[in-house]
């Protein structure tokens, strides 16, 4: 007798072992038709999985997130099937699920063209309509190697040869195609109805630039056509908002080959940067942080003591001078510990909060670089809090409150919080980890926020809270972190004198709110589509004259605004006013002031707000008050 507990708490009993598909059929024909897989005691399996002992079972359908992952994984295999069918000489490699879709890497003797993608997608649709059953078989490693070698698939054979000889290998087949995979997969190809191939890109075998270059075909797959259409519309909107395009259009920054992964900030872009940095500086100063500055280049010995040289060396830029090895800092924490160590600290000094807009450099691979989002040189709004064990909960509460307030000011109202818990390989005792994890839970509870827990995702030296902001397109970006560190203070000899005169290690909290300033500015630009709120806009107002007779008046207006701290420019060119308005509208300036003879004589201005909104004619003082209220509403 096999007892199966369902999600609603009910229990079904079966005389003999049953498959997930048979359980679904016993519940009802609708569920049997909808079943894509199952979860046996939390493990995702195929509908063909046999149940021969008492378990908890959930039937997975397209309504579940796991169901969508199964569909996308199976669609990746369908893509490989279609490519092999159309181009038999192509070799398959790997094809995982990624956010919003999947990809598959191929080795082929010529580049795939857009016309090829159309042809492949059409063939995928034809194969899906055949509704071929998907079968799974388990073989030994050596059997799998021999099979893929026999059909000329050297990449698959190489993958399997790297697997321990004692491991069993799962092979999935549909029609004339067989692939290596952990699974699970849909029961038949007819379940794959909504998909689209997106693009082709280059990739290296096993991600190593020393290996052969492959072709990566990206695709997306969904359970409903309307979901796919919404996603494709989002991509179109994202293309319009691309910070690289807007950076050029708005004259904010540029990048060039002579300095890969580094940013050339133009005047307006640097003005935007300064608004963000000065805002952050005010907020951390108000929160009791002490701003410091640490060297960009430090001796190898310090990086060895911190552990970075051993564990992060390949991502560090290094140099040599006078027979000494140095590294350009990839992060600020070792330098902050040096400031803490400079002098004897007492428990009365704690908590000590050190903040730095620290310039860091990391040797990211050239293929990973992406505009402002992934750079080699960046500035972090970094800070480290040195505190006692009794203080770290209150410090965590204060940080969470500050971070959530900052995100709201920048226009991010939806923030997801994740708590990464202890990994298998870790420093410290279970008791220490228990206190650390529970302390962070207590802090988040006190803040009234909800969070998702990620078992095993913490760093080896402590648990971490992550802050993921959602932008206007619903995309999630991890920005803030609060990382508890139980290792670095010991490695670098940080200590304080406790109340009983003993020497103790401080708790160290690494924290950032926006993270990389470059990346955050890229997110901001895309979130606001370049139309920054008035308090952030690099140019808040442009004053324009209609004719030369108003030049002096327009200049005086601009000067008056500038004295009030407004970021303003005067456009006095001998151009049609419609041309000027259009040009500055494309620059996404929040307010345009137009002056003609009537406005000059009445000492007023005609005001146009961004979006072409005519606010009418008003005295300059009235406009300044309106602008002030606009700025204060955001900040």
From Swiss-Prot:
Catalytic activity: tRNA(Thr) + L-threonine + ATP = L-threonyl-tRNA(Thr) + AMP + diphosphate + H(+)
Pfam families: HGTP_anticodon (PF03129), TGS (PF02824), tRNA-synt_2b (PF00587), tRNA_SAD (PF07973)
Keyword annotations: Aminoacyl-tRNA synthetase, ATP-binding, Cytoplasm, Ligase, Metal-binding, Nucleotide-binding, Protein biosynthesis, RNA-binding, tRNA-binding, Zinc
NCBIfam families per record: thrS
Cited InterPro entries: aa-tRNA-synt_IIb, aa-tRNA-synth_II, aa-tRNA-synth_II/BPL/LPL, Anticodon-bd, Anticodon-bd_dom_sf, Beta-grasp_dom_sf, TGS, TGS-like
Subcellular location: Cytoplasm
Disulphide-bonded residues: none
Cross-referenced Gene3D superfamilies: 3.10.20.30, 3.30.54.20, Anticodon-binding domain, Bira Bifunctional Protein, Domain 2, Threonyl-trna Synthetase, Chain A, domain 2
Binding annotation for Zn(2+): 333, 384, 510
Function: Catalyzes the attachment of threonine to tRNA(Thr) in a two-step reaction: L-threonine is first activated by ATP to form Thr-AMP and then transferred to the acceptor end of tRNA(Thr). Also edits incorrectly charged L-seryl-tRNA(Thr).
HAMAP family documented for this protein: Thr_tRNA_synth
Leading EC class: ligase
Source species taxonomy: Bacteria, Pseudomonadati, Pseudomonadota, Betaproteobacteria, Burkholderiales
Residues of the TGS domain: 1-61
Protein's organism: Paraburkholderia xenovorans (strain LB400)
Source superkingdom: Bacteria
GO MF, any single term: tRNA binding
Region spans: Catalytic: 242-533
Co-factor requirement: Zn(2+)
Keyword Zinc: yes
Main location per the UniProt record: cytoplasm
GO cellular component: cytosol
The protein's assembly and partners: Homodimer.
Name of this protein: Threonine--tRNA ligase
Entry annotated with the keyword Aminoacyl-tRNA synthetase: yes
Cofactor note: Binds 1 zinc ion per subunit.
Protein encoded by which gene: thrS
EC number from the UniProt entry: 6.1.1.3
Family from the record: Belongs to the class-II aminoacyl-tRNA synthetase family.
